[in-house]
Each structure stands twice: as structure tokens, then as C-alpha cells.
């Protein structure tokens, strides 16, 4: 039987750090006592690790994320407001030719439950940017990023985490 509950951290990182973040999350959970003492080999940790390619603004091949960084992030995790913008996994993001990052939004639903969304934006060409149907991206000139290394990939990515307290 599945519980339907997410019991693991949700971690966001760059493409080449998925393995390091996944392994460190399991180590952190074991060291912090999340591994039931009587579970023996029957306990498994299945962290959720999502990635975006940040090679335009980051030395992605440097493998800079280490276990101590993951431990620090998990130890500092807290309820309430989260940092947004150029932080954590959002540090190397580019969105529609602008510096991207992490953003959030939430709504109080009828009945008192909250729906929250966290987005790590790393997609889109400037000329494709539209706001309420207006093609503003094609009208914006002179605000190009100083680093214009093109992505070697045709596609781009966005991570959307949706959660509720219902």
C-alpha cells in the first residue's frame, strides 16, 4: 500500500549534480535519524531531485556541489517564506534572455487550504516573451545579458513544484 504522502525532501540542482545531491540527501536522512532503527534493510529513501541545465552561467562540469552543501541546505530548511531569485538552484538560470531564478506564488483556497507553487525558470528566447498576450520580448532592446553563450540544446527547462496543506 502506498501512503500518498511525500516523505522526502524535494531538491533542485543542476544537471550534473543530480547524483551527488541524491546520495547526500540519503546520507543526511540516515544521519539525522530518519532511518528507523528496526527497519533493517527494509528502509529505503527515495529523494526527489529535479534538475535544470545551468551551463550558460555556471561551470557545470566542475561538479562543485558536495555533500556538505546538501547537508547545509537541508539543515537550514524551514517553514514559511523561502528565498527567491538568484539563490540555490536558481543561481544559473536564464529565462527569456534575462537572468532567471526561483519564484513562488500561493493562494488561500475556499475552505482554508493553501496551494503553493515554486518555479525554477530556465527557458525561452527573448523574442518569444509575452505578457498577457502582448509580445513584449520583441520590443525590449538594450538589456542583453553580458554572457551570451548560447545553449547547445534546442529545448530548455522549467521546474514547477506544486504543494498544498490540504
Please report, for each region that a protein language model flagged, where it lies by residue.
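Alpha/propeptide regions of enzymes that mature by internal proteolysis
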Residues: 1-166
Amino acid at each position: 500500500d502506498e501512503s500518498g504522502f511525500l516523505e522526502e525532501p524535494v531538491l533542485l540542482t543542476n544537471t550534473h549534480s543530480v547524483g551527488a545531491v541524491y546520495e547526500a540527501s540519503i546520507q543526511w536522512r540516515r544521519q539525522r535519524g530518519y532511518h528507523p532503527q528496526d527497519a533493517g534493510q527494509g528502509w529505503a529513501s527515495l529523494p526527489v531531485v529535479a534538475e535544470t541545465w545551468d551551463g550558460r552561467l555556471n561551470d557545470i562540469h566542475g561538479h562543485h556541489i558536495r555533500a556538505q552543501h546538501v547537508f547545509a541546505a537541508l539543515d537550514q530548511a524551514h517553514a514559511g517564506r523561502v528565498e527567491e531569485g538568484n539563490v540555490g538552484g536558481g543561481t544559473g538560470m536564464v529565462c527569456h534572455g534575462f537572468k532567471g531564478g526561483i519564484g513562488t506564488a500561493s493562494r488561500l483556497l475556499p475552505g482554508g487550504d493553501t496551494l503553493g507553487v515554486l518555479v525554477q525558470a530556465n527557458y525561452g528566447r527573448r523574442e518569444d516573451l509575452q505578457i498577457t498576450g502582448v509580445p513584449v520580448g520583441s520590443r525590449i532592446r538594450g538589456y542583453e545579458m553580458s554572457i551570451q553563450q548560447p545553449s547547445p540544446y534546442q529545448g530548455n527547462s522549467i521546474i514547477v513544484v506544486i504543494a498544498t496543506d490540504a
